[in-house]
Regions:
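Phosphopantetheine carrier-protein modules
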Residues: 18-36, 54, 58-66
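Juxtamembrane helix-loop boundary signature in multi-pass membrane transporters
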Residues: 80-82
Length: 82
């Protein structure tokens, strides 16, 4: 799975957790999950668990702590898939 596919899947995963789905329409790798998309930190944990299920990977606490933007999530996932 390439970076673009992972990014698109991340947008799909984030949709239920974003209060205003329109915010995802112009999302980029630099979009901050907590600040720009208004996902609270408790919901971010749910997003990470969903990523683990969808991509069949395990994201440890150190990797989870690095996830701030959609691009951060893509990089962590890509690293786990390779």
């Amino acid at each position: 799975m390439d970076e673009k596919q992972i990014f698109q899947e991340m947008v799909t995963i984030l949709k239920p957790y974003v209060k205003d789905p329109a915010l995802l329409e112009n999302a980029t790798k630099d979009t901050h999950i907590l600040d720009d998309l208004k996902v609270n930190s408790a919901r971010l944990v749910d997003v990470i668990i969903k990523c683990e299920d969808v991509f069949d990977i395990e994201i440890d606490d150190d990797d989870a702590d690095q996830i701030r933007t959609i691009g951060d999530a893509v990089n962590v996932i890509q690293g786990k898939l390779n």
